[in-house]
Each structure stands twice: as C-alpha cells, then as structure tokens.
C-alpha cells in the first residue's frame, strides 16, 4: 500500500554527452561530493556543490566500461581497443591493468569488485580476478554440457494440456519458428553484462546466430551454467535483480509488450506487461534500484523520453511514477545511487549535461481510514473503516487519462498530480464507492509547467504546498488555483506565494488544526523549521523547531489529545527509515519500521513487535508481537483497528487491546453500557472493566446502567465475570493511570464483588420482573442461595413455567445438591420438592425423608433439618423451642456440639434445665482445666460441692470459704486446709489472713508471717498484741538480715566477675585486632551455631558447615540456646552469654530495692536488738555499693555498637561493607533485642536516712 | 435329496432392540439382513439357530415379538415386516412400506377388537402408526418429529380402558406420551383415529435409549433408561373425576397442611371420562455407562423385576424393597476382554433366564439356579461372526470347522457331543482376534493353521494345551495321537500383551496366591489368560480372552495384502498369494511349514490369484485368478518344487470373467473352476499334447448358469454312493444360493437347490464338504453366516 513520494528533485550541472556516471562510495561516513562522468572519451571529475568545476582526469578513446575500484581508490577504464587501465582519480596517473588484443566489447565488475567479466570483440567471455589474472575464457556460443541441458520431466504432450483462453485448437498448432528466422544481423549487436547482487553469477546478453537475442548465465568461476529458454523478440537490455530472483529482459509479443522475467536457470518465470508498445517506444535502459525495490525503465519514443518506475507487491507490478523528458534535451543515462541510505535516489543525466537527482521515499498516502495506491493511470482507493480489501484489489478505482505521480487526499478532497503536471481536483470523495463527479482539471501556469513539484501537501481548503529544489536551496511554494479569465471553464493553478530556504527540503508536515503553520525539514543539517502563513498569504520562516542528528525521512505533526481547545499543543513525530523514531526530538524507539498516530496513541512497529506510546506523557503503554516484517498501513480509531501489511503484500487487520479499551472507555464515558459490553465481549475484554473504568461514575449511574442494558443475559455475564480485583491496575493498566483512579469511600477492592452485587441487587429489586435472571446471578455471587431460591419461589406462584426456567438458570450456576440443602434450610417442603424434582434424586428416598420430617412438630422438624444441614446453633434454638420433652436430647446435643453458651441463651426461660446446662458446662470446663470458671458454673448449676472442690484447686480461698459456708461445712477446718497450699504458692499474706481469721494459735500466726519474711507485719501484729517482739521475731529477722547481706555481697561479686570477664574478652578481641578471625577459626569445630541465625562471615559460606542438627524442635532449641549462652570460659560466644547473664542479673538486683528497704525498716524497728542497727546499716551499705557498681558499669557493658543503631545499618548494607562490623552485628543478633540495650533501673527511694 | 441344516452361526447386529425373547421361548434377532430365530433351550441345555427369515434387503435394525407366532421387524431398507411363524419357519409375511429411511424401532399391540396396532419409527424422523387386521394393513397416522429422531417406542393398553398409550423417546432427552384423541367423532372408524401428544416426561439429561411398560396393579409403570446412566420409573395411575379435581397440589401450602408430601402429578385426560396421573416414581442409579435396554418382568406373584443392560458391560436386575426403594438384586456381566458393553437385554418369558447381546454381537444368557435363586449361571448359546465370513476350512478329519471373517477373528466351530442327544454345534475357540480384517485360512494339521488378513504377512498358529483338553472333552475326540504328542510340550494358552499385537504363548499360569496380591503392576498384566476347564461350550467372555492360540511364526514375503492360502492334505506345504496388479506380485509363494522357509515362487498369473487348491495327492497345485485364467503346477518327481505345466489362455479358457473358485475331485482326476460369468467347468487330463498351453487338460463338462456369478465351488469327498464315476458338486452364487449337482461323465444334474433362507442372502464366499463318511457341507458368506448342512441322498 505504499507509494513513491518525491522528496526532492535537485538540478545540477555536469558534463554534456555523458556516457557513464561513477559515484564514490561513502568513505568514513561522509560522502564525497565529487563524482565522475565519462563523456567524449574523457573522464571528468565533477563537484556536486559549489561552483561547477570540471576536471579531466583521463583521456582514452572509445571507453566501453568504467568502474570505480573502492579498495584501490582507482578508476578502471576499458577501451574498445582492448586496453584496460587504472587511473588514479586524484592525480590522474595511469597504470596498465591488462590488454586484450582483439578488443573489448563490454566490461562489468562484480558487485564486490573481486572479479571482472569481459566480452571481447570476438565474443569470448573472459573472467578475471581483480589483479587481472584470467580465471576462465570461453566463446559465447559454447554449448552447455549435455548433463546441464534442460530435461523434459514429462508433464504430458502439448496436445493434452490445457491451453486456457487459446482454446482447444491451440493444442494442434505447430510452434512456428518464423520469428526466429528473421535476420539477426538487423538486430542491435550490443553485448551487455549484468551481475547478480551477491556476485555469484552474471548474465551476458548477446545476439546468437539462428536464435537472435538470447542470454547465458555464468557463475563466478566462469563456467557456463545455463542458457536462456527459447524466446522470441528479446530486446537488448538485460539486468539482474540484485536480490537475485529475476533477470529482466524486455520482450515483444504480437499482442503485448512485456518485461520478461527469467529465473537463474534461464526459464521464463513471469512478466511485467508494459502499458506501451515496444515497437514505438523501445526500452533503452533497465535499472533495478540497489535494494531491488524499484525497477526503472527508460524508453525513447519519437517525441519524448520517459522513465517508468515499477514496484511489486502481492505479485502485482505497480507503475508508481512516470517521468517525461522532452526530446529536445534527451536523456543520456539513468543511474540508481549505490550508496547506503540513498537507495531510492535516481540520477538522470541529460545530453546537455544537466544532472537531475530524484530522491523518492516510500510512504503510505492515508486520509484517516482511506488509503490510496497509485498504479499507473489508476488510483486504487480503499476505505479500511468499511472493509479490508486485499491488494492489488481495492474498494474503488479511479481512472485518469495520464499516469499519476502523486495524489493528496485530505478530508473530502482529492488532488491528483499527474505526470504531465496537471492536477485533478475532486472535492467530494466522502461518498466513496458511489459515483464520483468528474474532477476539475487544473492546468499548470507557465511557471509551474516546467517545475517538478515535490512534497505536495494539502494545506488549507484551497491551498497546496509544494517544494522545488535547485542547486543548494529550495523554494517552498504555496499553490492556489483559479479560473482562467480568458477561457471560462478552464482552471489553472499557480504559485500564490513562495519562500526560499537554504538547503534541500525533504519533508513537509502540516498541523491539521492550525491552518497557518507547517513544518519543513532540510536534508543538509536535519533542521526542522516552522513556517507560518501570514495574513497576507505570504510565507515566513518563523523559527527552527527541532534539531535532529540525522534528517528524518518522514515527519508528521500530531495533536496531543485534550489540548486542542486550550491553545493546543502538538508534537512533531519524525522517523528516519529503519532507524530512530522521535517525538519533538525525544527518542521513542530504535529500528522502527513504520508508525501511525491513532487517537491519543502513537503506534509504531519494529521488525516483529508493535508498540503503543501515549502521546501526552510519551509513556510506552503496551506492546505486542506481530508477524515479522509487518508495517502499519493505517489505523481506524472508530473500529479500534490497525491494518498491517506484510512484506509479501498481504494485509492483516488487528484490533489491539489498547485501542479497544480506549473505545470501550469512551462508550462508558458516554453511558453506552450496552454497546460497551457488546464490544468487550466481541473483543474478549474482561467485563470487570465496565465497573473498574470509573468506579464512582458507575456507582452514581447504576440506574442508567441497568436501563441501558436491554438483555438480562448480558447482566448475568457481567455479574458472573466479576472478580475482586481492579483491572485498571492489573490486566488493563495500559490505558489507565493508577493514581487517578478514585473510589467511593465505602468501597474496597477486596470486596468488589460483594459491593457491585449489592449495588445492583438493590436497584434490580425494584424491577424484579425485568431482572430476574441477573438478580439470581447476583444472589449466587453474593452467596445468598436462599435469596435466589426465594425469587424463583415467588415466581412459581404466578408462573410455573417461568419458575422452571429460572431454576434451570440457577442450576447452571449451582450444584443441584447444594441447592437442595438450601431449599431444605428454608423449612418449606414445597420448595424442597420443587428443587428435588429437578435433580436426579430418587423420590423413593427423599419423599419418605420429607414425610418423616413433616410428621414432626414444626420446631422439632426445624431442629432435625438444621441438624441435617449441620447448622447446630440454629438447630439448638429450634430444639429449645420444643420445650420440656426434649431436655435430655438437648443436653446431649449441647454436649456433643459444645453449644453451652448458646444453650444457656436459648434456655433462658427454662431455669431448672438451665442448671443442667451449667453443670454440663462446668464439667466441660473442668475437663479442659478451666477450674475457676468451672467452679462458677458448678455454683450456678447448684453443685456447690463440686464448685467448692474446683475453687479449692485454684486456691480461691474466699470462694472456698463462701461455698463452705453455704454448704455449712466447718469453716475453720476448710480454712486450715488451705493454708499449706497457699504457703507453697508463696501467698504468705493470704495464708496469714486465713490463719489469723480461723486459727487462734498465735504462734502459728507468727510462723506463717515469718516464713513469708513478712517481718514488718509481724512486728505490727506483735506490737498490737504487746507480744515480745525480740523473742519471737528478732532471731528470725536477724538471721534473714545476715543472709540477705551475704546474698548482696555475692551478687556484687558475681556482677563484678561477669563484668571483668566481659571486659577481658573484649580487650583480647581488640588486642588481637583480627580477633574475630581467631575466634572464627574455631568456629569450624563448634556446632553451636544455629542454622537459622546468620553468622556468615566473608570467610565462611553456610554450605560448608556440617549438616545434621537442625535444632528445629523447641526442646532442642532451648538446649541449644543454653549451650550457646554457656558461661564456660573459652566459649566463642562467651561475651554474648555474659551480656545475657549480666542483663538478667542487673534486673534482679534492681528488684531487690523493696525487700532491702523493708528488711532494713524491720531491723530498725527492733530497737532493742543490739546487732540490728549495724546489720541494717550494713545491708543498706552493701546494697548501695551494689547499685553504684551496677550503675557505673552499665555503659561499659552495653556499648553503643551493641545496640546496632541505624548508623550501623548504613555501612552494613552500603557499598563499602565493613565486614568486621557486619560480623559483630551478626554476633549481637544472637541476643534478644531487649538485652541489647542497657536495663532501665527504676530507682525508688529505698534508703533510710537514719542508716546513712 | 434332503438337505438339513445342522448348524447356523451368526452374531446379532450392533443395534439396540435388535434381539427379543418371544413368549414361545425363541429368541429372534437381527443377523445382517436376516432375522435368525434361535431356540435357547434346544434339547434342554443346548442352543441352536432354528431358521432364518430373509426378506429385508439391508441390515435388520430391530425385531419384536408381538405374539407367539407374530414377529415385527424393521430394517435399514426402510420397511418393517410382520412375520407369521410356525415351528418350521415363516408362513406369511407382510411388508409395511411407507418410510423413506431405515426403521429403527417397532412395536405392536393387539387391541380388544382383535386388530393389531403397529408403530414404527424410522430415521426419516417420522413415526408411523398402522392397523393390521385380516391380513390388511393401513397406515393411519404419520407423526413427524420435525428434525428429531425416535430412539425407542412402546405401545401399551391403558388399564381399565381400551385406549392405547404410545410412549417414545426422542433426541430431546424426553419421553413423549401420546394417545388417541378424546373426540368421539371418528370412533369405530380406524382411519379416523388420530394420536395426539399428551405429555412430555422430562428429567433425563441425555438421550433415552430404552423404554418399557408394565402393569402394576391398576397403574402402569414406565421405565426409561438413558445415556445419563439413570433409569427413571414413571407411574401412570388412573384417577376418577373427583380425584382429578382434588388433585391440585399447592406446593406453597405444602408445609402448612397435613397432607402427605408427594411428587407433583400431572393429570392427563386420555379418554372420555378417563384421567390419569403421571408422576415420577423413582430414580435408579447403578450403572456407570449409558443404559441401552430396559425390560420388565412380572413374577407369578405379581412382583416386579426390571432388567437393564448398559454399555458398562453389566446387566442389572432391579427389585423393589418393602419400602418401595428399588435396589439391584443381581448384577451380571462381562469380565475382561476387549469389548464395549451391552446393547440390550431381555427376560425370558418365565423370568428365570435373562439374555443380553453385546457390542460385538455376542449373546449371553444367564439362568437362575432353581435351588439357589440368588445364583445366576451362564448358559450355552450360539454366537457367530459379526462381519462377512471370507474363508472356512475343515479340519482334515472333519473334527471341527474353522472360519475367518472380516470382523477380525477366526473362530472354531465344533460339535458338542452329549449322551443321548444329537450333537449341536458351537463355537469352541476363537484362535485369533486380530487388528486387521481376516481374509484367508489354511489348516496345516489338526492343531496348526495359517491365516492371512488384510496385511502383508501370513501368520501361523498352534493350539495350546488348554484347547486340546477342552476340545477332546466337548467333541468327544478319541485316538488323538497328534494331540498327545503336543500336550506336554505345548503352552497352556495365549494372550495379547497390553501393548502388543501378536498372540503370545503363556506357559505358566500364575497360581491363585500370586494373583491375589494386588499391586499396580497387576492392573495391566502382561497376560490375562486363565485356563478354563470346560464342561460345556464356552461363553462369549471366555471366547473373547481365554481361547487364543499362540502365534508360531510370521511369514514375510508378499508385497501386498494376503488374498488366498492353501495347504496340502498332509500339511507339508503351504501356498499363499496376495493382491496383485502385475505378474510379479501375482506369484504364488510356497512355504515349508517345518522350518517356515520359502521354497519357491511360482509365476504364471497376471493379476490377483483368487483361490488355490492342491490335488489330494499333492502332485498338482491349481490356481485361479482375476486374469480369467487358471494355472496348473505339477510337482516334479523326487523334488518339492513345482512347475507350471498347464494354463488357459484367451483362446482356450472357457471362462470370460474372473475365476472365483476351484476344487479337486477326491480322486484327483478332475478339477473344477467357477467364474463370475456363471460358468462352472470340470477339467480332465485327456492326452499329452504339448502344442496347446493346456497341455492335454480339456474341459470335460461345462455348466452355465445365466445371470449368476458362481463364487464358490466344491467337490464332495466321495462318489455318489454306489457309483464310481458320479461326483457331487456344490456351487455357491453371488446372490447367496447354494446348488448341489451331480456330475457324471460330463453331464450335470441338479440335485438340490437351497433358497436364501436355507442358504445365504449375500455372496457365498466358500463351500467345503466335511471330510469323513457323512455327506456334510459347510458354507460361509458375506451375510455373516456360517452354516453346516447334512445332505441325505434319497
């Protein structure tokens, strides 16, 4: 679907009567602007730009072939006399290559310039290497080896074959040889050679005796490989397509003129039918472009010379361009540029010395969805919005009188620019396919009739833009058309205004909504200029817009969506063929083969992928694979369709999800839910998007949603597809901006299904008759099968058959057995029967069961049903309603299913029975060792004895006594029995209370107090009773004081020991510098390391450690910890263990404050005991020392690095990891976090002033 | 001359409703295009096909007994036939023409006025209703099912009424109930009667393939068996007008009133003042596959039994418990084997026996043990091939007959000798169950044979020990020296390994202990052969898996499918030919059975050799061919190699079309050839004459039957009793007829002519007289039949 678009045509001046053109290939990136022309036995060097400076570098008569040898940087010239010399292009120095004494007819170098082929005057084919050593020589008319000649494989005789339109009599015709008999001497005797692109084969065309013009195929070894099939009337040009599949030779038939295409083996393969007669317009030159895309045919008729450019697609030859030249200044030669990147550049040299350089580019001419293809005199138009017509067919064909060179389609107008420089204007093509009115023909005015216009572009309704280049500058032309004043009815077009730009303009882009601005780009420096149209219709170059590194081949101005109204912003998309794609100079992609803008997206293709870029933020939103080599033809936004053309020419239309979502989104915005759902279904879009697209809007317009959807089945689909997931953030995130998505306040994504179903259900419930099916679906989605059944059941009363249908629908969604259970759960036998009859259940089984149930009283029936359905709580409530006769069963049921609390609630009215439940509950509680609760329950259940026992077990002595009282048991005795256990539990005070209350033995009272070290209390009691304190209390107290003192001393010692040891270890580690490494060496033998804690050093990898113990069980783990925290000297983790021990110790010490204070106070109270005061003072002193020692040492022990603060973390994870610190950190990680900080000592005022 | 049929063997067609057990105790079933009538209680404990009824021209799809002497059948030839039978066969038949496509199911019922109401359903999506009275039949209604099919239909007289109820199942998964119009307009005029649809029974979730009615007290019970694996029982109970009016059950009030919960009833008005309530009685689930046939039986004390046959290879008899729940009482079926399942099943008239026919056409019969009613034992039955039978061969002394068929099996038929009774013939073994259609067969010795299928190799087999034991026992063989020799060395049996293609010998049989240990490997054992000591001819499931013969050798040599085989009388040579279109492939290969080497290739023919025959003394080998020629090869003295000595050519061959068959006279003096142009020629060596290609063999007698193609010919094994020059020949034709001729010195005389019911109804493929003293002839044909005749000369 591509056309050749003329980028520029520049005119240069060269040498008159040129014979050959030599272009220097690119050297070091830059192309030399010097080229060589052979004319009049001389070789001229021509400077392309600047002043035309001709330099003769060699002079040789009768030049038959020249070649620029790239490696040698020399020009190889062959003369008819047989001389082959090498000429240095700079100095003009010559050196002899070789000599052929019989003279040379033709010379051709292979494309890789390794081999050269000559045909001598004696029709010998000579093949030489680049150093002119002969590889092979043989006469042209040598016969093929017999084993290489054609073999008839026998597809039957000619008589039996099908002859198509020639009919059956064709079978009987003898092949006439008359055409061959013609005197071959009359033919052009030229010999021409053409190499295949890879240099493996070449073809020599010559006139053979008897046969006339024919050709032979030789390989690069000089061996004759094939001869041509017998064909009459071949002409003298021959050219091998560089990709190698065809040899093109003009051939004349009685009824048609063709370019015959032969295969390598010399067999005719197919042909290209020419639109003219070879007799009248003989072909002078055939040239394939270097990339094989374009075939240029130069013809010479009597009155004018023409150049035809053909391309092939889908095996159809399209005539894309026709250039017409007057005979007054005839053409001398055609030459396709061989340089990289300039494959579509054609050099045309005229006899007068004029040098025209045409630069074409392939482009798709699209007008929204309409794409046109030029094919000679026909314009093939297809509207891809309506149909995908595969080329070479098309929706409509417009025929013109002359060949079309370009056309512009914009909006409803169509401008066709033909080879004779007329413009045909048709202004109403929006009715494509219907009869088009006859176009207006615009004649060029005098100025324009001589200009070859390039870059024809539509600008505004009555203006066109075009460029015309000459030498180094370009004129931008604004063309308008008007009525011819002299001849009414005749129209002509003319230059309205123009502006000259320095440099060659190769692309023009017009801003579609601007009307007065456009952009042009020049080849020379890659500059893009903004040009504006002034009010007086003159053009002005405003500013340089974007500077690219390399000039682009294609530029396009696009509007960025949403900006049209507020001053609009646009962007310039530029693409260099097969290269880089830019938006306003910002690089989007590499190796881009084609692009197209559709709505808000820029779509571009790479070799086998298609990408979508959002225009506003230039974010690539989606990609997909496409068939290899496909290029975009056009995109139809309205159908979300992208049409691709594959290399062979066939079309493929795809609906990319991004575009479809855009359409669906648009429909949703406009509230066209039905259409949106239809489109989603058609394009396999998940229906969740209907809701997720805009949650708030959906919620607010849910009524409209329901109204719009006329088919309830669609709603069912929608509901059943719902998922607890926001698709705009997941599957379809390409089209949505997650940050812009807002939700109603009460909505959460993980409850989406429920939310939507509730929402719709509320609405649908108002019009149940319309939304029966979706309502049922919604209930199923919500898990309310019962509600769904009720909807059907209600319907059943009015319309049984409809209810059957609804049930059928429900059965699609739910298993019939589940439904049966749900129906049973309604206790409505009618409903049960209704459902059961639709299932494969045997009536003989379910009927007796239902009848059994029905025979029961209602409540008990419900109980049985609930029990059957395992709804135990509900079952129990119904059983409770059954009353007395089921007490036993209820109790059993409660026990069985553990429904004690429920049972108590349900049986609130049944006070007597409740007691049974309490007892059962208590039994249960006792069984699970909740004795205190059990006691309470027993009490409520009236089982006081049991309550007492349970309370006793928990040593709840108040309750025990109260219960004992209730049971009128001897209180004292009960109380006494409790004292011992209380003491064992360390609850001395309570024990004392009991003893005091219930035992009159004062001694025993004191014993209890003293045993609990409750000296203050003892002193108080003694004081009250005037007992002798010293006698009873003092000895015990003093003994205790001494014991406490020694214990404090021991604590201090222990603390100091630990601390010292810790400091020693640390010092050792610090001293040895690499102390950790020393210890680490031992690690190998130590199996204390936990597998779960990480202690990997840079020296040790975890895998080298021995396997075996995993310390997985908790018992093992504790044992392991104990081992790890062993205080045994030499343990590699001793410091850790010490810290742990110290932490515990310090905490314990801090807790001593109250006991010490109390003890001291008690000692002080013993005023009469001589050694009490010193003891108290000593105690206080000892403790103080202890506390001070602790306090002083805290910071020494808990160093900052132990804490592992945030600072530490930095260099542990940063780029420069401090492995030492990392090791330490890992060691400290063995400690529980709490113990990595120094213990907070909560100090109270524990000292007695008097003891200081 | 009297010809009596000794044995007929044929399988039931692969259709549902294709077999029925009549009130007279006979089982009628569709066998190819014929209906076979079998007496399953022949001589008390045996079974025999009594006769065949031939009138259909295409496959018989369904048969149904209407009465003791009336049988209704339907076939693919779009006709239904009402047969009237007596002890010896058919007396009358009436062809019901009208359908345009195959008739699939039929039923008929006798009405109070003595006339018959017949219903037929066909693939042309119509059901036709006929009345039949006084040998006249009229089709009075055609029910069009638009584009659906009827799978099964039943007619039933309504209780307490003269109304007929028609139930049929269609491909819409429902059962339709139709009855006559209530309007009295056309009463008395049979043509005015019209059936109308009254109700559709829905509930099945797949096609309903079996229906049956039974009268239960005042009610009717309809059983429907479906491909959804369920059987549903529907109750059709008469209702009075009052009941009808009260009947309305309000589902919505069900929980609140005191009525018993019942299944919803549908009230139909089927007569002027007759209302019936239709309700679902029960749903039976027990089969794991499609259910094809259901059949009711009512015991003398009015208890109901329901039989259901399923594709899951089981047949279940259902009985109601006291609570009315239907439970399976007996489940019988096939165990193992490469079969699919049952296509139908029936109770016998007394309900003490049940019959089922399977996918491969085999019959099973189980009888209730009179002493232990829970015990159902399998009984003796006659089966047969379910594809065209292409070759047969008698054992050299006539002890058994072996047949090869396109159903990919070879079967061995032998007489069951019982004291005090005539022997009946049964299938005793199935030596080969193959993956290709069988084509040819040659017996090398009593316990060794070669067979050719539609493949390029000839396979040879030898009987296993287990067969020899059972064969001797059942057929009463004595003095079996060959067997004695083999018994010790032979394998016990054979089986086809799970992933194999050839029968492998099984030497050692796993002891019981081992086989009980269940491991995963045992699920797919390498062999599943179980030796069985037979008292009676074996049942189908035994035949299917336990009577294989181990394969001895594969003979490779032919380039195309094997076509004919022959062996010399002493088994010392085997000759084989294959399909051929040129002389190279048409060569005959001679094999040496002692070492299985090729001895020689004999050329002579241009096209496929259709049959081969060695002369009784093995001196000559005769071959006949598609190229309308015969060739005669003679063994040179003192060598095993044969040489072409005579053949016909275009000038002297009497036959102008393909020569189908050939045979030698027992004395080696004559040989006979028969061809498609209806010519039978007896050739005799007259004098040495080297000039002609015939080399002295001359046509001694030519018999030409116009418009017949003689596809089989055979000489008997002796002269006509009392003569020394009169030969007896049997001819079989393409139309299925068998003719017996005597041949005396060039003169033919027709002795007997068997019609299609007696002989075959499609091409006779092979005829052979039984070796031995008695004159017995075996025949096989494309109609799946294998028959043995006893010929008595009068």
Curated annotation (Swiss-Prot), chain A:
InterPro entries: A-sol_ELP1, Elp1, ELP1_b-prop_2, ELP1_N_b-prop_1, HB_ELP1, TPR_ELP1, WD40/YVTN_repeat-like_dom_sf
Pathway: tRNA modification; 5-methoxycarbonylmethyl-2-thiouridine-tRNA biosynthesis
BP terms from Gene Ontology: dosage compensation by hyperactivation of X chromosome; establishment of mitotic spindle asymmetry; long-term memory; tRNA wobble base 5-methoxycarbonylmethyl-2-thiouridinylation
Keywords tagged on the record: Cytoplasm, Cytoskeleton, Microtubule, Nucleus, Phosphoprotein, tRNA processing
Cellular component terms per the entry's GO annotation: cytoplasm; cytosol; elongator holoenzyme complex; microtubule; nucleus; spindle
Composition-biased stretches (Basic residues): 1106-1116
Sequence segments annotated as region (Mediates dimerization): 814-1252
SUPFAM superfamilies from the UniProt entry: Tricorn protease domain 2
Region annotation (Disordered) ranges: 1097-1116
Name of this chain's protein: Elongator complex protein 1
Natural source organism: Drosophila melanogaster (Fruit fly)
UniProtKB/Swiss-Prot annotation, chain B:
Start-end of each WD repeat: 55-93, 98-140, 147-188, 203-244, 286-328, 337-376, 384-423, 433-472, 557-601, 604-643, 654-693, 705-751, 759-794
Consequences of knocking out this gene: RNAi-mediated knockdown is lethal in larval third instar (L3) stage. RNAi-mediated knockdown in sensory organ precursor cells abolishes central spindle asymmetry during asymmetric cell division.
InterPro entries xref list: Elp2 (IPR037289), WD40/YVTN_repeat-like_dom_sf (IPR015943), WD40_repeat_CS (IPR019775), WD40_repeat_dom_sf (IPR036322), WD40_rpt (IPR001680)
Location of the protein in the cell: Cytoplasm; Nucleus; Cytoplasm, Cytoskeleton, Spindle
Gene Ontology CC, one term: cytoplasm
GO biological process: establishment of mitotic spindle asymmetry; tRNA wobble uridine modification
Subunit text: Component of the elongator complex composed of Elp1, Elp2, Elp3, Elp4, Elp5 and Elp6. The elongator complex associates with and stabilizes microtubules; efficient interaction requires the full complex.
Task of the protein: Component of the elongator complex, which is required for multiple tRNA modifications, including mcm5U (5-methoxycarbonylmethyl uridine), mcm5s2U (5-methoxycarbonylmethyl-2-thiouridine), and ncm5U (5-carbamoylmethyl uridine). The elongator complex catalyzes the formation of carboxymethyluridine in the wobble base at position 34 in tRNAs. Binding by the elongator complex stabilizes microtubules and promotes their growth.
Name assigned to this protein: Elongator complex protein 2
Species: Drosophila melanogaster
